[in-house]
């Protein structure tokens, strides 16, 4: 009370603090930014403090900013406390450069300040902007970017910028401007670890990142366990001592008294000594002033001591007395131009102003200013080097420019004037001609027909003169001449005689008779006004004019055509029967050449196509859709030499198809009608008969095409011509596809914010807060953002009492997600046979570590034929048949079954190998049975539309049902791929920046062609995407993967992984299965023992480009090990592996692959079974 009364007597009371009182003085930046383990792109790790998570950021565009309320409080505290302190525990990647803290705004590309750890320069940079001008302070030799944990404290307070690591001061400089007083909140955002560009994002781990507002750095260090040293009480004037401790910024090592020289030659220049003397003069003035101030303090202390009768002890009030004035606790005042003081717990703590190094050689002191200053005239060259020589002229002809430059010695001068000068130069006129490619002129009119009757030709020409190629320009492409047929009236055809028929038998055998022969006017018949044949139709001739002998042969005892031999005694004998007959010469019967020589005519395993005649034979014409000869003859010699050859017609090979010039003719086989189909080439779309440009390679043309009647398939204009969307979904029917429509349902809410993108709901009600609007939520009162509906009844699984719709409630259903009304459970493990991955072995946990759909309990991985099915579950254990096709369901696969349809007709003679038809009916005789005509596997899908015509289990490309296989399923954070299904499973979009994973379909293949369109719809990230084939388990598969840029994987354990840009083809045969070993091996371009082997990598190392459509095509023939990968960019082949041979796996499943890449479109997917 006495001390308070004394103060009141002096007229000094406690002073009210100015400004609003802010309770919180420490802010956890992770907490107020809502950064947690669920934040996309933030991976959680264990740091030095086990109770608090550490984070590594890999997707900086997803880092949330500090919330607005807390940012407002931070800015107010920074102004009130004259700055702030940033504390953190960090482990920065070696030699990396990264931002610790940044305040962006108020504009989209503006910043107010940022703290950047510059590993290459080994500095900690503070950049801030005042009135649009950038200022930079940096602390040197900080040693932060060495991949070691550091506990740092950054001081940005009053006029000081310093760094403490642990309890040690590393470096400190003086701030030029109190920028923290001008910070703005409106339209501003504060981020942790996020830089202004990709190169300035923080690379490493962060923990315990706080903004602290304290009175001094000692308060913060003491809370970290640091011991107080004398440095904490520097510049303190105590009431109990008359000694002033100078700060380390003021050195007293230099003595100006006369001393003996330590060496004969001075190592300092006169200019340096002059600067030193100027600084000492200023220091002398400062020390004298401080000495006088100390004397006044001692006098004032003595006065107060006498006034109050000795030191008082009080707990309620503290104050300081200086030069007769009493100052309240924490009050700050100015002593002189170089000194400020603050009252701290009865002590007066004074701080010296530290001057920045002079920027000129001869600084001067100004009255009232603490620090020396520099002045320059505007036209002075002080500090500049001499001008360099002029550069060469920037052009080789015409008017150009030259430049020269000079440099500034910034260590001691502030140079005025430009550093670069520019002047114009001229080297004569330029040749105005330009390189010009040739162009065709218009076509000339068609010439007259080359004939006056019948079929001829007309011709037209064009010249390469519009313009003529010059200066190395290219010649015109294409032909300068074009010809087409012309039709005139048919020409007259004069009739001509056929050959004479054989002479008829003579009317008598001797003494003269008559024989005749005839001819017909049909070779050709007269047509179109032609002349008739001239001459007689019949001709007669005398025969057997000789006298009649007495001869036994005169009575013609032999078979006509057989030679008769007579003898003098009147007897006779007959020679052999004529060709085409069998007998003794007297009696001859027709020889059936068709029965003796069975392969005369082409056979289709049906009725004989050879017709026996009397005499001779002939073959029926070739069956429909075959072409060949039609032989005929008499006798065995003709039968053995004249064979009928019928070959299947192939319009693609014969060039008789009607496909467009930019389409490919695909031969379907002679059993199909039609025998071919037309598909537009890559870069084009249409029905094959008409093809147009297709920029995004999704199978739809840029413009409408005039296709054949009722043939609108892929002839309609693409509703998203620059973004692949093979399904062409357009919910609001506005002509803009959903893929590129910003508001699919036209409810005035953009798709990005719409919680029902495909349903009009402007009110956006969402009762269960699952980000799916009530109008389209299949469980509107139950949180279920995935919207899974197993039985497709409109009620989501999350709120359905019977998920699979088998009339068995979930709590009693042993297969709640698989329809099984019988609830059969052979092994009694509580899991129904329909969904049990070991139906004959008790395994209630259903663990399947290798993701091959066989539970670990019964998985032995013994597979002698490498087709992905272990021996005890393989229906052909010794013959590779990945598809396990068994069309007669007899337990024996078609690959090892001699009668696939069990109709009693062996496969090699069965005209419908997969369909039961013991009668083998074949109406048109083409070798294909009627029952499987145009649908070989009898799956009700015509072969021309069937992607697997010989497998009734696969009819179309469909990835709507797939198995999600995470390849690195463990870790502190796990981001799985997010697959969006479109176009009935023919288009999938992966939206997340995820860990490696596969979406693998359930259809299984041996020989297969697999193609699709690849498109990355973002400019964020640059990592892997591709597809898999021959998938047998998560340890055994082939993968084609494509990286945009070369990059080392950020986790170097368990093995360092270097990923090179370009397309790679790899075979995975992992001994460890999914996890970090397989993850790093997949990233690595090369071989990793026991994990991955690279079969091919594109030597051009071409990475994919953002917003660019590519088309891949895979060919795989497991029987020979042949595989080939082609990648098109537009119409051109960008990468081609050529023939690659590997027989590690004999087939498997197909799927899509991603590794740390978001917004990947897999569009217009297509797989087709092929003959081995």
Curated annotation (Swiss-Prot):
Start and stop residues of the TSP type-3 repeats: 693-728, 729-764, 765-787, 788-823, 824-846, 847-884, 885-920, 921-956
Motif Cell attachment site per UniProt: ranges: 928-930
Skewed-composition ranges (Polar residues): 870-884
Record region (Disordered): 727-752, 846-938
Domain VWFC: 318-375
Compositionally biased tracts (Basic and acidic residues): 885-895, 925-935
Molecular function via GO: calcium ion binding; heparin binding
Domain TSP type-1 residue range list: 381-431, 437-492, 494-549
UniProt domain Laminin G-like: residue ranges: 19-215
Residue ranges of domain EGF-like in the record: 549-589, 648-692
Ranges annotated as spanning the membrane: none
The protein's assembly and partners: Homotrimer; disulfide-linked. Can bind to fibrinogen, fibronectin, laminin and type V collagen. Interacts (via the TSP type I repeats) with CD36; the interaction conveys an antiangiogenic effect. Interacts (via the TSP type I repeats) with HRG; the interaction blocks the antiangiogenic effect of THBS2 with CD36. Can bind to fibrinogen, fibronectin, laminin.
PANTHER family named among the record's database cross-references: THROMBOSPONDIN, THROMBOSPONDIN-2
This protein's name: Thrombospondin-2
Originating organism: Mus musculus (Mouse)
């Amino acid at each position: 009370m006495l001390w308070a009364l004394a103060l009141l007597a002096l007229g000094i009371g406690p002073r009210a603090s100015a400004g609003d009182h802010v309770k919180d003085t420490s802010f956890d930046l992770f907490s107020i930014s809502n950064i947690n383990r669920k934040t996309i792109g933030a991976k959680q790790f264990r740091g030095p403090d086990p109770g608090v998570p550490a984070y590594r950021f890999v997707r900086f565009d997803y880092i949330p900013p500090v919330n607005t309320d807390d940012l407002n409080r931070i800015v107010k505290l920074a102004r009130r406390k004259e700055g702030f302190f940033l504390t953190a525990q960090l482990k920065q990647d070696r030699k990396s450069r990264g931002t610790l803290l940044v305040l962006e705004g108020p504009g989209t590309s503006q910043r107010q300040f940022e703290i950047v750890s510059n590993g290459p320069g080994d500095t900690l940079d503070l950049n801030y902007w005042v009135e649009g001008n950038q200022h930079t302070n940096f602390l040197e030799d900080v040693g932060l970017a060495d991949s070691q944990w550091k506990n740092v404290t950054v001081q940005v307070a009053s006029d000081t910028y310093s760094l403490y690591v642990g309890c040690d001061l590393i470096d400190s400089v003086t701030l030029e401007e109190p920028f923290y007083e001008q910070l703005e909140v409106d339209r501003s955002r504060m981020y942790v670890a996020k830089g202004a560009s990709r190169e300035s994002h923080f690379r490493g781990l962060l923990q315990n990142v706080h903004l602290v507002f304290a009175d001094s750095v000692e308060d913060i260090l003491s809370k970290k366990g640091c011991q107080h040293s004398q440095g904490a009480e520097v510049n303190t004037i105590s009431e109990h001592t008359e000694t002033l401790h100078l700060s380390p910024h003021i050195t007293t090592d230099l003595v100006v008294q006369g001393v003996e020289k330590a060496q004969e030659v001075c190592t300092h220049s006169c200019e340096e000594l002059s600067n030193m003397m100027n600084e000492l003069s200023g220091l002398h003035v400062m020390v004298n002033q401080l000495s006088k101030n100390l004397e006044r303090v001692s006098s004032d202390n003595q006065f107060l001591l006498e006034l109050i009768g000795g030191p008082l002890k009080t707990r309620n009030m503290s104050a300081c007395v200086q030069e007769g004035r009493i100052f309240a606790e924490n009050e700050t005042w100015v002593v002189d131009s170089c000194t400020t003081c603050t009252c701290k717990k009865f002590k007066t703590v004074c701080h010296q102003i530290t001057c920045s190094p002079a920027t000129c050689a001869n600084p001067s002191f100004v009255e009232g200013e603490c620090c020396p200053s520099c002045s320059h005239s505007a036209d002075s060259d002080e500090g500049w080097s001499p001008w360099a020589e002029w550069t060469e002229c920037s052009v080789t002809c015409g008017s150009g420019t030259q430049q020269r430059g000079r440099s500034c010695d910034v260590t001691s001068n502030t140079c005025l004037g430009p550093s670069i000068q520019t002047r114009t130069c001229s080297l004569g006129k330029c040749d105005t001609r330009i390189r010009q490619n040739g162009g065709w002129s218009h076509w000339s009119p068609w010439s007259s027909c080359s004939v006056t009757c019948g079929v001829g030709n007309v011709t037209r020409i064009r010249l390469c003169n519009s313009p003529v190629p010059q200066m190395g320009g290219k010649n015109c492409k294409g032909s300068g001449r074009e010809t087409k047929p012309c039709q005139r009236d048919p020409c007259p055809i004069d009739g001509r005689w056929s050959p004479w028929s054989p002479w008829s038998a003579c009317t008598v055998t001797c003494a003269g008779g008559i024989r005749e022969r005839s001819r017909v006017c049909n070779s050709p018949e007269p047509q179109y006004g032609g002349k008739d044949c001239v001459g007689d139709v019949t001709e007669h001739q005398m025969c057997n004019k000789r006298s009649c002998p007495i001869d036994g042969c005169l009575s013609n005892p032999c078979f006509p055509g057989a030679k008769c031999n007579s003898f003098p005694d009147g007897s006779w004998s007959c020679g052999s029967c004529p060709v085409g007959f069998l007998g003794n010469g007297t009696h001859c019967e027709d020889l059936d050449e068709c029965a003796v020589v069975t392969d005369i005519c082409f056979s289709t395993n049906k009725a004989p196509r050879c017709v026996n005649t009397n005499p001779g034979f002939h073959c029926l014409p070739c069956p429909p859709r075959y072409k060949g000869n039609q032989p005929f003859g008499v006798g065995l010699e003709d039968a053995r030499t004249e064979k009928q050859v019928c070959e299947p017609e192939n319009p693609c090979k014969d060039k008789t198809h009607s496909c467009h010039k930019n389409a490919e003719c695909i031969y379907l086989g002679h059993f199909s009608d039609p025998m071919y189909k037309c598909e537009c080439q890559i870069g084009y779309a249409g029905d094959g008969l008409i093809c147009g440009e297709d920029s995004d390679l999704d199978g739809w043309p840029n413009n409408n095409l005039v296709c054949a009647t009722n043939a609108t398939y892929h002839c309609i204009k693409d509703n998203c011509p620059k973004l692949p969307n093979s399904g062409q979904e357009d919910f609001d029917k506005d002509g803009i596809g959903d893929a590129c429509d910003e508001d699919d349902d036209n409810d005035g809410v953009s798709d990005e914010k719409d919680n029902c993108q495909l349903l009009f709901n402007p009110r956006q009600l969402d009762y269960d807060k699952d980000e799916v609007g009530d109008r389209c939520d299949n469980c509107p009162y139950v949180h279920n953002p995935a919207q899974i509906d197993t039985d497709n009844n409109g009620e989501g699984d999350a709120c359905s009492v019977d998920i699979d719709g088998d009339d068995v409630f979930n709590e009693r259903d042993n297969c709640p997600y698989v329809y099984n009304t019988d609830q059969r459970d052979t092994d009694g493990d509580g899991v129904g046979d329909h969904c049990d991955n070991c139906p004959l072995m008790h395994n209630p946990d259903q663990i399947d570590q290798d993701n091959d759909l066989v539970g670990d309990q019964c998985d032995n991985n013994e597979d002698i034929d490498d087709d992905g099915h272990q021996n005890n579950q393989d229906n052909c254990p010794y013959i590779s048949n990945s598809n396990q096709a068994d069309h007669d369901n007899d337990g024996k696969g078609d690959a090892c079954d001699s009668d696939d349809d069990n109709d009693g007709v062996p496969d090699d003679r069965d005209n419908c190998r997969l369909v039961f038809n013991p009668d083998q009916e074949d109406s048109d005789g083409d070798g294909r049975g009627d029952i499987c005509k145009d649908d070989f596997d009898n799956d009700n899908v015509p072969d021309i539309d069937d992607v697997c015509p010989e497998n009734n289990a696969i009819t179309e490309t469909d990835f709507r049902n797939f198995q999600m296989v995470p390849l690195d399923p463990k870790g502190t954070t796990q981001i799985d791929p997010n697959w969006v299904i479109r176009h009935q499973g023919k288009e999938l979009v992966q939206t997340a920046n995820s860990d490696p994973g596969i979406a693998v379909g359930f259809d299984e293949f041996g020989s297969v062609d697999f193609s699709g369109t690849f498109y990355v719809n973002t400019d964020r990230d640059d990592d892997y995407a591709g597809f898999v084939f021959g998938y047998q388990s998560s340890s055994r598969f082939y993968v084609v993967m494509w990286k945009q840029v070369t990059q080392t994987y950020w986790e170097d354990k368990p093995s360092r992984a270097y990923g090179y840009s370009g397309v790679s083809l790899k075979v995975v045969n992992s001994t460890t299965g999914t996890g970090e070993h397989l993850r790093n091996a997949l990233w690595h371009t090369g071989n990793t023992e026991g994990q991955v082997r690279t079969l091919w990598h594109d030597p051009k190392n071409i990475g994919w480009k953002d917003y660019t459509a590519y088309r891949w095509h895979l060919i795989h023939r497991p029987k020979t090990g042949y595989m080939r990968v082609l990648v098109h960019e537009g119409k051109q082949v960008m990468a081609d592996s050529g023939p690659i041979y590997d027989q590690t796996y004999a087939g498997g499943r197909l799927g899509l692959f991603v590794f740390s890449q978001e917004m990947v479109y897999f569009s217009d997917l297509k797989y087709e079974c092929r003959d081995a």
